Amino acid sequence: MRKKLFGQLQRIGKALMLPVAILPAAGLLLAIGTAMQGESLQHYLPFIQNGGVQTVAKLMTGAGGIIFDNLPMIFALGVAIGLAGGDGVAAIAAFVGYIIMNKTMGDFLQVTPKNIGDPASGYASILGIPTLQTGVFGGIIIGALAAWCYNKFYNINLPSYLGFFAGKRFVPIMMATTSFILAFPMALIWPTIQSGLNAFSTGLLDSNTGVAVFLFGFIKRLLIPFGLHHIFHAPFWFEFGSWKNAAGEIIHGDQRIFIEQIREGAHLTAGKFMQGEFPVMMFGLPAAALAIYHTAKPENKKVVAGLMGSAALTSFLTGITEPLEFSFLFVAPLLFFIHAVLDGLSFLTLYLLDLHLGYTFSGGFIDYFLLGILPNKTQWWLVIPVGLVYAVIYYFVFRFLIVKLKYKTPGREDKQSQAATASATELPYAVLEAMGGKANIKHLDACITRLRVEVNDKSKVDVPGLKDLGASGVLEVGNNMQAIFGPKSDQIKHEMQQIMNGQVVENPTTMEDDKDETVVVAEDKSATSELSHIVHAPLTGEVTPLSEVPDQVFSEKMMGDGIAIKPSQGEVRAPFNGKVQMIFPTKHAIGLVSDSGLELLIHIGLDTVKLNGEGFTLHVEEGQEVKQGDLLINFDLDYIRNHAKSDITPIIVTQGNITNLDFKQGEHGNISFGDQLFEAK
């Protein structure tokens, strides 16, 4: 139960990042527009006092401000999409649910425009609807409910006479019903919840603000490895605390108050739960990266310089710290704990210095410049001496502990032991043993990319052993293990099943052939690494980076590098001259090898293995030679969209030695059959 809850919290935390991602763009418009209207910038740049420039500045301020004014709705849409695997139907359902809930609450409580005029009432006008103000929490609740409706009903079957409403079309219908029902308990209990939140936040800030900001920074940093920090900071940024703007509206949340004060040019009082990250992200962590570089072995310093240099620059400019933090988190947990303590102390230090800095994305230089230096509303320059002190502390603490405790930070690792080897015949036995043996297997399954095993006791699974056997990654979700063996996953599963049933695995790829093939493949790989391979688009549609595919195996490139296409037509065509290497039994995936030796996997949709071949028509067979543009597979696009998690189609280079992909038309935009997709080297 606890593991399941933890997994759900991780998903919610990740989903919150989608609506948060729009805030930097809104903040950029608002910050520049506000700065152009301020006396400070006009003093240095008199030409911006021109009437036309000021009109543009006001438009920019309004365009940025409207995003912050409608954050609850944006959170509803974003959380719904995030928890539903990226499907837009969930967003439509969330919008339907959001307006129905607010309209029903307003009518039930008899809220009128006159009621809204009283700030103490807790009422507000949302999208023109007089209703109860539930804030960002209300949006998150609706988003989660819409995602639940989607995941529950997206593939529902109805009688033939109601067939039009089956599948994904049923989701907004259910959402309309559930949000109408939800409105009544929300109308009755939310005022009490809101009063409790206000009392808690007021007491927290009034009792001992210094302790509060220290604990906030410390706990938020400790939660990063678990992906729960987005859940933790959301109430502080969007709900806790209150401030009345010039129009008499009550604004809640440290970040929202800060942005509103910047927009109005008011005296700054917010930023306590954001500003502590500037010294750490701009100075402390880059200094830690320098310490890691200086303690690396001489023969590894060139590689570490590239790794740490890019991570440090990312932290300084944008405030994205995970690439740097995860480089030492697991090998040196004490360093991460000290890092969390220093983060909390940074919040406390800036609070004691009476600074008021905020951001829309993170504590990097970009936000520091736009929302600190340009508005010039607080003593922003004090961050620099504090940051320099932090740089010295981080550098010497990290360097001393890395050397003293012999931490294996990047560049200090021992030479890797030789990976375990197993022939094709031995591999299923070895994988079964690594999974804890037959008695530990509760359920065995596979798809085109991974071996899916539900085990009785996760502690018996040898994760490093699975990686030594060729798994490019191992995912753990409760007692469910997913070992990424690529296209051979289904074969391994089939042979493991035979072993468990007491059958003999007969010559899956004969021993002699396997040895010969290994030599040939090794030679091919060394040769192909020097070649250039042109891959043309096998589908027509919209190009999407792998990082945006809502499946961890593809987004984290466990199968290999590549790109994805969201198809607009139900055809897959050969992307080059070559041969069909493998077709998955359920027809949803095909493996190809080009005449130049490039191995490519085309995986139509996500979780389409569950369709058992329905909606797919093959036009080729394994071993068949194909020419570029030959029709490989037809698929029913509407059926996949209605019955699968997503129609997005990853296109993966499965050779680990080919890592340089040049996307000729970029990783976004539309593409058609035959257009050059990328060049692989």
Swiss-Prot record:
Keyword Repressor (UniProt): no
Residue ranges annotated for the PTS EIIA type-1 domain, each copy included: 551-655
Cellular compartment(s): Cell membrane
The PTS EIIB type-1 domain, residue ranges: 425-506
Entry GO CC: plasma membrane
Enzyme class of the recorded protein, top EC level: transferase
GO molecular function: D-glucose transmembrane transporter activity; kinase activity; protein-N(PI)-phosphohistidine-sugar phosphotransferase activity; protein-phosphocysteine-sugar phosphotransferase activity
InterPro entries found in the cross-reference section: Dup_hybrid_motif, Glu_permease_IIB, PTrfase_EIIB_Cys, PTS_EIIA_1_perm, PTS_EIIC, PTS_EIIC_1, PTS_Glucose_EIICBA, PTS_IIB_1
Chief place of localization: membrane
CDD domains the record matches: PTS_IIA_glc (cd00210), PTS_IIB_glc (cd00212)
Listed EC numbers: 2.7.1.199
Active site: 447 (phosphocysteine intermediate), 603 (tele-phosphohistidine intermediate)
Catalytic activity: N(pros)-phospho-L-histidyl-[protein] + D-glucose(out) = D-glucose 6-phosphate(in) + L-histidyl-[protein]
Record membrane topology: Multi-pass membrane protein
Residues passing through the membrane, by range: 16-36, 73-93, 126-146, 170-190, 199-219, 273-293, 303-323, 328-348, 355-375, 383-403
Functional summary from the UniProt entry: The phosphoenolpyruvate-dependent sugar phosphotransferase system (sugar PTS), a major carbohydrate active transport system, catalyzes the phosphorylation of incoming sugar substrates concomitantly with their translocation across the cell membrane. This system is involved in glucose transport.
Record protein name field: PTS system glucose-specific EIICBA component
